[in-house]
Amino acid sequence: MANKIRRDDEVVVLAGKDKGKQGKVLRVLIADNRVIVEGVNLVKKHTKPNPQLGVAGGIVEKEASIHVSNVAIVNPATGKADRVGFRFEDEKKVRFFKSNGELV
């Protein structure tokens, strides 16, 4: 299946503990069908100090991945979640918003 959400897209979370939050996609994990969204689904990770790498130990908050079905791309024209489709323009495959037909 083609990936409808890509890095740097603005998305909104549709389900889960962070439902309604918006953020920018930092990374797309294609093999797992998951995305990492900036400031959403934060988890606390306990890290050991590593003097060789210059890493101090402690508790670090970082973003965990969210399944791609639980996020939707935000249409900048409406500011709301929207569905995305594909079509060909000038022999190039482009993404468009299903509500108004504008290109992503």
Swiss-Prot record:
Keyword Transcription regulation included in the entry's annotation: no
BP GO annotations: translation
Keyword line: Ribonucleoprotein, Ribosomal protein, RNA-binding, rRNA-binding
Functional note: One of two assembly initiator proteins, it binds directly to the 5'-end of the 23S rRNA, where it nucleates assembly of the 50S subunit.
Source organism: Alteromonas mediterranea (strain DSM 17117 / CIP 110805 / LMG 28347 / Deep ecotype)
Xref: InterPro entries: KOW, Rib_uL2_dom2, Ribosomal_uL24, Ribosomal_uL24_CS, Ribosomal_uL24_KOW, Translation_prot_SH3-like_sf
Protein name (Swiss-Prot/TrEMBL): Large ribosomal subunit protein uL24
Any single Pfam family the record assigns to this protein: ribosomal_L24
